[in-house]
Amino acid sequence: QNTATPPEQSPVKSKRFTTFWVWFFFLLSLGICVALVAFSSLDTRLPMSKSRILLNPRDIDINMVNKSCNSWSSPYQLSYAIGVGDLVATSLNTFSTFMVHDKINYNIDEPSSSGKTLSIAFVNQRQYRAQQCFMSIKLVDNADGSTMLDKRYVITNGNQLAIQNDLLESLSKALNQPWPQRMQETLQQILPHRGALLTNFYQAHDYLLHGDDKSLNRASELLGEIVQSSPEFTYARAEKALVDIVRHSQHPLDEKQLAALNTEIDNIVTLPELNNLSIIYQIKAVSALVKGKTDESYQAINTGIDLEMSWLNYVLLGKVYEMKGMNREAADAYLTAFNLRPGANTLYWIENGIFQTSVPYVVPYLDKFLASE
């Protein structure tokens, strides 16, 4: 009896079946490896790109390390340091190729791209069996950590001007930055000739930096006292006029007060010794802006910027751009101002100086930057 035998499987078909699965698993494994390598490289690269900062040797940060001595406290101590820091920053930004960021009012500890750091601190040190308070100023090159300048000053009632002059001269040598003749002439015009008067002026200037109503009122009072006691100090007279016209922009003066202020401004802007100073054009810019004369204000503040690169000039430039409906340019101006002097003071000026500004609307980048703090 014949029985049916099943047909034998073709060797060629079996080989093709085996080859298919070999290649399938090989390609699958290869794809998984490629995906894992891609994910791992992406995961390691992203954090590195956020943390890497290249130093700029021409940028300088000014920081306040310690605001007072433990054994001695003076209402003028901090104002003097703030005034010196503001003067150094404005002088270098105006008369050199360095870009200085005055961070005395900025308390956020974050990485910086500045190649150099100028630190101001008040420290106690035992001197002749007694505790004495020193103002310590140190300039460090962040590229190699070396100290370029290390000075300590004992502040007395009459040596404030001498300390400031010595510091400027020492910075000139440390940075290999000769001061031009125009800077020397400017300092002669904007600073009093007596050290004790400088402390009072810096206290009034500190109130101006704050920018709020109470501070501006106090600044006006102090500057009025300085002008009354030292009428030859015409720069204090100009700064009082600036403070008063800003106060008027926020809370209008009565008719009699405004007439007196306008007369004072007319007299100040004609003083020959102040003609080449930025503050004259700040006064003109604010005065014109209050009256709605944006083109006149724009011309004035740009002349002021040519004479002095300062945070206040760029705040005022931003205000002029806003009034002209040029919000993109206003945002650039406000960011420049905050970059020159970051902190709550400059932010207050941006938001409330002359008129109120919506930072989220006009400068959304700055709003997000501050929110991330």
What do the PLM-derived regions correspond to, one by one?
Residues 205, 242, 249, 286, ...:
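Residue-level recognition of tetratricopeptide repeat
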Residues 1-15:
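N-terminal intrinsically disordered, acidic low-complexity segments at the extreme N-terminus
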Residues 210-213, 247, 291, 324, ...:
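Structural motif corresponding to the intra-repeat A-B loop/turn of tetratricopeptide repeats
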Residues 23-24, 29-82, 197, 208, ...:
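A structural "domain/chain start" motif
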Residues 46-48, 84-202:
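Catalytic-center loop of serine/cysteine hydrolases
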Residues 234-235, 269-279, 309-316, 338-353, ...:
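Boundary/linker segments of alpha-helical solenoid repeat arrays
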Residues 196-225, 229:
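Alpha-helical segment of the N-proximal tetratricopeptide repeat
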